[in-house]
């Protein structure tokens, strides 16, 4: 893959390749550039490259390359310049459309060119044979060869663009435009399969949008602009689906539109709702859902009447007539279903009711379901009857409010004939293209037939078939019979056809039917009134009062009994339904398990049979292959050998392989013998040939020498002649140019002098320039040398100062260390003396205490005797001992220890000095500020039995030193 420093270089390279006809190489070069990781930031040249890239993709019909390139370009432009991506995609779709249109116009031009009077005369025999063999027409073949590839590429373009633009809030408008173009393509060329695929893709895009809500740049469907774009796309999808008669896709599109409309509380635009309900009328009519078809027409009528102010009275009358006829076309009875079918029908009604915006409350017990009576009451309340045409109103009155069993059909038939002629296209203001009332004629004829049968059953017990056929002129009696059977099945009318007697018998319907209940209630009221008039009741106030007292309780009890009975019946029904449902579930489960077991067994049996068949087939194929190879080897042996090989026994591959091996060995030996004999013969022939050709070669060599000698002499003569001619021509040229020799010499001399002068001048200038340069260089070197000398002197001076300073510091440090050592030695000596002195004093004090104790024991008197005064010697000894004892932390010289110290008592002296008397403390001397390590040195001689007190000892030492 070639790498380019700039994107413009890749574009130039691609254009060069295009000019020489290598479009594939140009496309590959641009593809490598676009997919490269070096260009991940958007640049203006990338847009030109993408334009050229999509042009090449369209020319070569490379849809996969186009998709890869557009995906990479979307990543580059997503956060920087989305408009550039839009321009590229629009250019891509425009080129694809143009190519498809060109192919189509080319085929049309070809068809016009072939549209001549005598087609047979223009066709060649080869064309006729080809058309006969292929069985295709010229147009179909042209379409497959020219148009179809471009249409496939155009469709692939639409799919690629939709895939690239999906679920992107910045590209919603372009996404909607592409979807509309794809729908129009399917509509124009009747592409139903492609339309289904496109709708499926768009639906999946919306599902993924709702599923992955944390996606970046996802469209917000709650925004009005986004929702409107999606609604417009689905409405266009609905239109195209109905025009292509894809009713299932149309119904799914309606559900998509309804789902989008329910996502927001705001009501969509009336124009969208008009299209929505107009298409719903078509879908429901096709699916024979006449009730919801009428509801859709009612919604459409309300929208047109409320929002369309430009609607003419004629258009409104046509729409109202359609609504009323659609309501009349609904079957007058509801179909009955089983238990499971009822649930399915209920779910279906829920879905369809939601589509026509008919709200159903699932929690209500007696909720209002969409029905024909409710719909007719809605039409009356909404004023639809007043807006409909007179013929439609008359038809409504005849079918719903008149009781004319004999003349009903005859009165309805002319009205239906008039109604069938009403209709046509509406104005552009109505948003409904066309109204056809004739589509309701068949349903209205069926309704008229049912009304005739219903009313006839009320007045006739039986009627002849001929008379009934005259009463219903719309259908043959077979059709009437079919309609009556369906009505009887749904308990709408009780009827029985007796073909033997040629009569139709009407029976009584169920006791629960509405019609019979009405007749019985009316009859009961009439009989009750007659009884009252004939036999008026006797007034008995006393009994009436007693009856009135107990009447409330009776009514209450009866009401409770009826409610209890109703609840019991409901519970029994529910229990019965539950039991039936459980039984059906159990049966279904058993059936499914047995079916599953049967299916598994059948699958295992089929697999075994298939495996056995496969093994048999492989074995047969191997045997057949071995036999075929054996036959082939036999044939090869028979072809190669001189005699026919006959094999006895069964034909096997191994036997023929052994036979072939033996035959090959025999042939090899024979061939070796033949080759040896042939080599000996060739030696004889070669030796004889060389003996015969030796004199002939010598003769030919001599002849060739003579020929070459003659040729050499001829070449020498020709060369001499040419040299003479050249010499003569050179002499003539010299004579011609000799007259200009003087001028040439003068010019040469002048030029030499000028060049010498110029050379001297330039040399002088060069010498001067060199001298100046040398002097300047000398000056610079002198300056640098002086500067370096000064810098060296300065460095030497600084170095000397630094060495002197270090020497001073070193001497001061050594002096300090000596002084410290001397001081430490003195302190050690003093401490040693002090320690010895303390030991001596302790021994003396101990001896003194022992003497005092002995003296006190000797002079101790009885308890009652007065205490005698101590002898004078003892007191003197004690005083001497007390005087001899030194004060705490005070140094006493030796010459003062034995002297008289009675003048200054030691106790008062110690109290005055220290404030208290305590044990003897001896600490080291205090450390000086300039010697921090002296205290650590003096701690080594301190004993463990003397506590340390730095403050007191330091102050004592300082005082003693002072």
Swiss-Prot record:
<feature type="coiled-coil region">
    <location>
        <begin position="555"/>
        <end position="755"/>
    </location>
</feature>
<dbReference type="GO" id="GO:0001732">
    <property type="term" value="P:formation of cytoplasmic translation initiation complex"/>
</dbReference>
<dbReference type="Pfam" id="PF01399">
    <property type="entry name" value="PCI"/>
</dbReference>
<feature type="coiled-coil region">
    <location>
        <begin position="92"/>
        <end position="123"/>
    </location>
</feature>
<dbReference type="GO" id="GO:0071540">
    <property type="term" value="C:eukaryotic translation initiation factor 3 complex, eIF3e"/>
</dbReference>
<dbReference type="GO" id="GO:0071541">
    <property type="term" value="C:eukaryotic translation initiation factor 3 complex, eIF3m"/>
</dbReference>
<dbReference type="InterPro" id="IPR000717">
    <property type="entry name" value="PCI_dom"/>
</dbReference>
<dbReference type="Pfam" id="PF22591">
    <property type="entry name" value="eIF3a_PCI_TPR-like"/>
</dbReference>
<dbReference type="GO" id="GO:0003743">
    <property type="term" value="F:translation initiation factor activity"/>
</dbReference>
<protein>
    <recommendedName>
        <fullName>Eukaryotic translation initiation factor 3 subunit A</fullName>
    </recommendedName>
</protein>
<dbReference type="GO" id="GO:0043614">
    <property type="term" value="C:multi-eIF complex"/>
</dbReference>
<keyword id="KW-0396">Initiation factor</keyword>
<keyword id="KW-0175">Coiled coil</keyword>
<keyword id="KW-0648">Protein biosynthesis</keyword>
<feature type="compositionally biased region" description="Basic and acidic residues">
    <location>
        <begin position="814"/>
        <end position="854"/>
    </location>
</feature>
<feature type="compositionally biased region" description="Low complexity">
    <location>
        <begin position="875"/>
        <end position="888"/>
    </location>
</feature>
<dbReference type="GO" id="GO:0003729">
    <property type="term" value="F:mRNA binding"/>
</dbReference>
<feature type="region of interest" description="Disordered">
    <location>
        <begin position="814"/>
        <end position="962"/>
    </location>
</feature>
<comment type="function">
    <text>RNA-binding component of the eukaryotic translation initiation factor 3 (eIF-3) complex, which is involved in protein synthesis of a specialized repertoire of mRNAs and, together with other initiation factors, stimulates binding of mRNA and methionyl-tRNAi to the 40S ribosome. The eIF-3 complex specifically targets and initiates translation of a subset of mRNAs involved in cell proliferation.</text>
</comment>
<comment type="similarity">
    <text>Belongs to the eIF-3 subunit A family.</text>
</comment>
<feature type="coiled-coil region">
    <location>
        <begin position="790"/>
        <end position="860"/>
    </location>
</feature>
<dbReference type="InterPro" id="IPR054711">
    <property type="entry name" value="eIF3a_PCI_TPR-like"/>
</dbReference>
<feature type="domain" description="PCI">
    <location>
        <begin position="316"/>
        <end position="511"/>
    </location>
</feature>
<comment type="subunit">
    <text>Component of the eukaryotic translation initiation factor 3 (eIF-3) complex.</text>
</comment>
<dbReference type="GO" id="GO:0033290">
    <property type="term" value="C:eukaryotic 48S preinitiation complex"/>
</dbReference>
<feature type="compositionally biased region" description="Low complexity">
    <location>
        <begin position="948"/>
        <end position="962"/>
    </location>
</feature>
<dbReference type="GO" id="GO:0002188">
    <property type="term" value="P:translation reinitiation"/>
</dbReference>
<dbReference type="InterPro" id="IPR027512">
    <property type="entry name" value="EIF3A"/>
</dbReference>
<dbReference type="GO" id="GO:0016282">
    <property type="term" value="C:eukaryotic 43S preinitiation complex"/>
</dbReference>
<keyword id="KW-0963">Cytoplasm</keyword>
<keyword id="KW-0694">RNA-binding</keyword>
